[in-house]
C-alpha cells in the first residue's frame, strides 16, 4: 500500500508523488501537461512571480495498492490517458 498525491497548477496535473513508510518517488507527466500549464498561465497573465506560484498546489494524500513506483506509474498513466478529456472539460463551452 502506498500513498500518492498529485501536484497541479490550478486544475492541470503536473507530477504524481507516491510514498510508503520508507521512500518517496515522483513521476513527471509528459511535456504536453507543462505546455498546457504555460499556455494557460500566459492566457491568464499569471506568468510572473506570485501570480504563477499561487496557482500551484497538491491534492490530499490518497492510498492505493502497490509500491510507490507502481502507484506513481499507474496514476500517471491514468492522467496521461485522460488528457483529451481534460482539454475538453477546460476549453469546450458548457451548455446552458
Can you say where each PLM-predicted feature lies in the sequence?
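Short, charged/polar N-terminal "headpieces" of proteins
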Residues: 1-25
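Residues in flexible loops and secondary-structure boundaries
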Residues: 15-17, 24, 41, 64, ...
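Acidic, low-complexity intrinsically disordered segments
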Residues: 48-96
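Charged, low-complexity, helix-prone segments enriched in Lys/Glu/Asp/Gln
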Residues: 3, 32-44, 72, 79-82
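Acidic, aromatic-enriched beta-alpha/helix-loop junctions
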Residues: 21-58
